[in-house]
């Protein structure tokens, strides 16, 4: 049953990769078409979760890159597909909802690096048309440090526009997490943009402060950049923080405890 569930998730993912700079030119990889939606409406509490979209970077999804010793096609640097945060969190959602949601995951490192030069409507055409019920935004690490007021404004404005475009397509619940490699300037601006868009911001800075959450603490890697990504423990912890945010959003205000 577990294997079948993971197969459904894998088939449901429409993958579009943007490789890390050290891995060479950008590459497109298309998987099988998404599986048909569940027969019944899926909900976690009050939160609809029929369609779930993950927008991230290499922590969310990275294709094989033999030059740096990475052979997976999932979130770097989990030891297996089912151990990255996307799949761990999807399993939690499916268990709570009583069915497997339709899932898309996309690496949008190109947005991180180009910000306002990235055409969101064209670059995320398929993802916008997907009209997800729940969107997890997990980016920031590939954006340059915000060394000037101009850079800070550009980053915030670009992030505002990204979230606004996502909100224009359907009526998604937005959850944005801070960076695994914490950066206060970027994290503060992502938080404000998220709150302005009516989303939930998840501070995961404590995860990157714990060496045990890094893949290098679990096994050896040829490339320091790969080793610096979350390992299985870090992925589990990241999923746990996001799941707590989902549960909070899923609880109607009228029944929340003070």
Residue ranges and their predicted role:
Residues 8-18:
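Bacterial N-terminal signal peptides
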Residues 179-258:
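Catalytic His-Asp segment of secreted/periplasmic serine-dependent ester chemistry enzymes
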Residues 151-160:
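Charged helix-capping and loop-helix junction motifs
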Residues 1-4:
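N-terminal secretory signal peptides that target proteins for export/translocation
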């Amino acid at each position: 049953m577990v294997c079948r569930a993971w197969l459904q998730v894998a088939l449901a993912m429409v993958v579009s990769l943007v490789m890390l700079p050290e891995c060479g030119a950008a590459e497109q990889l298309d998987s099988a078409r998404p599986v048909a939606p569940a027969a019944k409406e899926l909900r976690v509490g009050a939160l609809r979760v029929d369609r779930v979209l993950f927008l991230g970077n290499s922590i969310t999804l990275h294709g094989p890159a033999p030059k740096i010793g990475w052979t997976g096609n999932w979130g770097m640097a989990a030891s297996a597909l089912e151990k990255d945060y996307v799949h761990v969190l999807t399993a939690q959602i499916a268990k709570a909802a009583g069915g497997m949601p339709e899932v898309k995951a996309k690496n949008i490192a190109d947005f991180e690096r180009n910000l306002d030069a990235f055409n969101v409507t064209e670059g995320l055409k398929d993802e916008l048309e997907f009209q997800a019920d729940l969107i997890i935004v997990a980016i920031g690490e590939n954006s340059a440090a915000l060394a000037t007021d101009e850079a800070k404004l550009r980053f915030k404005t670009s992030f505002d526009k990204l979230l606004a475009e996502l909100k224009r397509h359907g009526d998604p619940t937005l959850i944005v997490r801070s960076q695994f490699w914490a950066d206060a300037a970027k994290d503060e601006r992502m938080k404000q943009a998220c709150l302005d868009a009516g989303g939930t911001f998840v501070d995961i800075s404590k995860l990157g402060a714990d060496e045990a959450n890094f893949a290098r603490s679990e096994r050896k890697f040829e490339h320091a950049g790969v080793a610096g990504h979350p390992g299985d423990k870090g992925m589990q912890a990241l999923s746990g923080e996001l799941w707590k945010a989902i549960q909070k959003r899923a609880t109607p205000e009228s029944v929340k405890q003070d």
